[in-house]
Amino acid sequence: LRELAARHHLMARIDFTRRIGGRVMGEAWREERWNGVRKMFAPVISVGEDRATATRYQALARLPQDSFGFALYEHYRSNDFAFPGEPGGLPERGIFHDLGHVLSGYATDPDGEIQQAAFQAGFVRNDGFMFLYFGIVQFHLGVRLTPIAKSETGYLDVDKVTSALARGAACKVDLSDHWDFWPLLPLPLERVREELGVPPLEPPSVPHLAA
C-alpha cells in the first residue's frame, strides 16, 4: 500500500508477486519438491503439456449440462481458456479461481473479476485480503499486477464488492486449500452451491423512479 501511495507501481507489483507467488511456490516445493516447482513454471513458458491431466478436464464435456463439472467445462471453453495440462493452461494449483467463478456466477469481464476477487477474499482463510487488494488495484486503480489481464479503472462498486465478499465468507470450505472438488463435479451445480453454503447471486437492483 505504501508503494502504491507513492506511485511506485513496479515495486507494488514486485511486492504483490512475492507475497502471493511466494506462498504458492512454497507450498509446491514443500509438497512436491522440484516436480511441484516445474508444474508451476512450465505453463508460464508454454511448455510442460500433461495429456493425462488435460484429458481428465476435457472429459467434463460428457457430464450432464446442469452439473458443476459441465459448468466448469463451459467456463473454460466459452472464455477460450486452456485447461490445466493443455499448452498454455494454468497450473492446477490455481484452478480454485475458476472454480470460484463457476460457484459465484461472476463473469470474467472487469466488473465480474473485481467481484470474484472479493468472493475469493471471503473464502480464502489465509491472507484472503490480498485477493481483494488485487481486485481493487487491478480493476479500479488501473495498476496492472498480472500479465493475464489488462488493468482497468473505476470498477469498484462498493455494494457489489461487499456482497461478493459476504458470499465468499459464507462458503463452508476454502477452495484454495487442497479442496477435493472432483467428487462434486457430476452433481447439479445448484446442489453444490447449496451444500457449500454459497448464497444465491442477487440480480442488480434497479433504482425506483418516483412517478
Regions found by a protein language model. Give the residues of each.
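Intrinsically disordered, low-complexity regions
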Residues: 22-23, 86, 198
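Core of folded catalytic or high-affinity ligand/protein-binding domains
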Residues: 12, 35-187
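The feature captures two recurrent sequence modes
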Residues: 1-58, 207-211
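Acidic, carboxylate-rich catalytic segments that either coordinate divalent cations
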Residues: 176-211
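Short, flexible helical or helix-coil boundary motifs
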Residues: 8, 48, 168, 172, ...
